[in-house]
Regions:
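N-terminal glycine/serine-rich phosphate-binding loop of ATP-dependent small-molecule kinases
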Residues: 1-97, 125, 151, 196, ...
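A charged, well-structured terminal subsegment
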Residues: 135-141
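Active-site core segments that coordinate phosphate-bearing ligands/cofactors
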Residues: 10-11, 115-127, 141-153, 157, ...
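Short beta-strand scaffold segments in enzyme catalytic cores
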Residues: 19-24, 86-90, 181, 232-236, ...
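Short glycine-rich phosphate-binding loop at a beta-alpha junction
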Residues: 74-82, 375-387
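Short beta-strand-loop/turn "lid" adjacent to the catalytic site in phosphate-handling enzymes
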Residues: 66, 70-102, 127-134, 163-184, ...
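Short alpha-helix plus adjacent loop in nuclease-associated cores
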Residues: 104-117
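Glycine-rich phosphate-binding loops at beta-strand->alpha-helix junctions
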Residues: 18, 209-215, 380-398
């Protein structure tokens, strides 16, 4: 196809540490992509809480769109994906500040109160969502107890909020909504019983599926992709067969596609989650991921390139491990101190800390994969790894050794590719 006739699409993929704008097009039957804009992201501390600068995110979204149009004049559509669970409250057309980040500790005190109304066993049976202290259900109940829901007329998950600010159309997208812990595993819609018993306001309409068209932003069609980044990432993995995957970033999401949710006792006991996919269920588990490594780097050797860090880890003889999913690693003041406190024998060098982190991640992958196979009754030969962590050969080797699987490491922007794929299919 001549370049002048080519259709271009824009994926805006925002992670907890950075965001990127990626323009994609079809060429020779494949999706080609080019990153045109990248920006930093991160939580900020305000009044003892962790928050997102939502206005800065919107500014970067618009700046990246302008950068994309400078290079690619005929962009057909755009879509936005981010991490799950976080949201913006609205009073009419005005957003309520602050926009809390999932690593904030405000939910800790309210979780027992939620369980006094809805025991976790009932919540899991109804929603199939694994326990995480930051799930939207606990955040919204914390808002209720703090009086933040007074006068609130709506809430939008972060990507849907940003899309609304671009095109003026509000929507609640299915894959991201499933991360709230408020969606019925049976119906695929918000669970009215849960919402009623928690006394939440009437702001839970019918959900929309990936591919739905919204309004326009400066002549560009806004589309709902799978706005939860992991759901888009799974769409972007070029699997030859259905096999387990790890979407490896700040979090490592390990899972497999299943026809329907699994909400049995074994799934609950092993803390597996059932999240929305594009016409399938994602049976998966959140694992702490590169958060451990990145925080250690920030603290121990902020200027050291990752290849040097990996070499130090490879050369270290330190073989102790920690529970990578332990709550003390979620948001510690010092990641080094958190490792020290969790280990009987303390690391003696920078390489020791990173070797411990990488080995701990590999063992957590192995444990989670064994649980997945037991719970689904299926055995797999391959494990696909995408995202930033797929570039780490040392971690891939450790994972292969622990799991006994053939590792298919694809250092691709799977999330952006999935986002683009959904837009292209919506344009058919």
């Amino acid at each position: 196809m001549e370049e002048s006739m080519r259709k271009y699409y824009l994926a805006i993929d925002i992670g907890a540490s950075s965001g990127r704008h990626v323009v994609g097009w079809r060429e020779d039957g494949e999706i080609k992509a080019k990153e045109v804009y990248r920006f930093p992201n991160g939580v900020q501390e305000q009044d003892g809480h962790l928050i997102w600068d939502i206005d800065a995110l919107l500014s970067h979204v618009k700046a990246g769109i302008a950068a994309a149009r400078t290079e690619f004049s005929s962009i057909i559509s755009l879509s936005i994906d981010t991490w799950g669970v976080d949201y913006v409250l609205l009073r009419g057309e005005v957003h309520v500040l602050p926009v809390y980040a999932y690593r904030d500790s405000r939910t800790e005190a309210v979780i027992p109160q939620v369980y006094s109304i809805l025991p976790f066993s009932e919540l899991y049976r109804r929603t199939g969502i694994q326990f995480q202290p930051f799930n939207t259900i606990y955040q919204l109940y914390a808002d209720k107890l703090a009086g933040r829901l007074e006068g609130v007329t709506d809430f939008l998950m972060l990507p849907e909020y940003l899309l609304w600010r671009l095109c003026g159309i509000k929507a609640k997208e299915y894959t991201n909504a499933t991360t709230t812990g408020l969606v019925s595993a049976k119906s695929g819609e918000f669970d009215a019983e849960i919402i009623s018993r928690l006394g939440l306001p009437p702001m839970f309409p019918k959900l929309q599926k990936p591919g739905a068209l919204l309004g326009e932003y400066e002549g560009i069609q806004c589309v709902l992709c799978a706005t939860h980044d992991t759901a888009s990432a799974v769409e972007g993995i070029p699997m030859e067969e259905n096999a387990p995957y790890i979407s490896s970033g700040t979090w490592s999401l390990l899972g497999v596609k299943t026809p329907k949710p699994l909400t049995d006792a074994a799934s609950q006991a092993t803390n597996y989650s059932n999240e929305g996919g594009v016409d399938y269920n994602r049976y998966q588990k959140n694992i702490m991921g590169m958060w451990l490594v990145n925080r250690l780097k920030d603290e121990l050797c902020p200027q050291m390139p990752f290849p040097e860090i990996v070499k130090l880890a490879e050369d270290s003889g330190f073989d102790e491990t920690v529970d990578a999913n332990a709550p003390e690693f979620l948001s510690p003041v010092s990641m080094k101190a958190a490792f020290d406190a969790a280990l009987d024998r303390k690391p003696q060098s920078v390489g020791d800390y990173f070797r411990c982190a990488y080995r701990s991640l590999a063992f957590s992958y192995g444990e989670a994969l064994a649980e997945l196979e037991a719970n689904t009754g299926s055995r797999y030969d391959r494990l696909y790894i995408v995202g930033g962590g797929a570039k780490n050969d040392f971690l891939n080797q450790l994972t292969a050794r622990v799991t006994g699987k053939q590792i298919i490491a694809l250092p691709i922007e799977a999330t952006a590719l999935g986002n683009l794929k959904i837009q292209m299919e919506a344009d058919q």
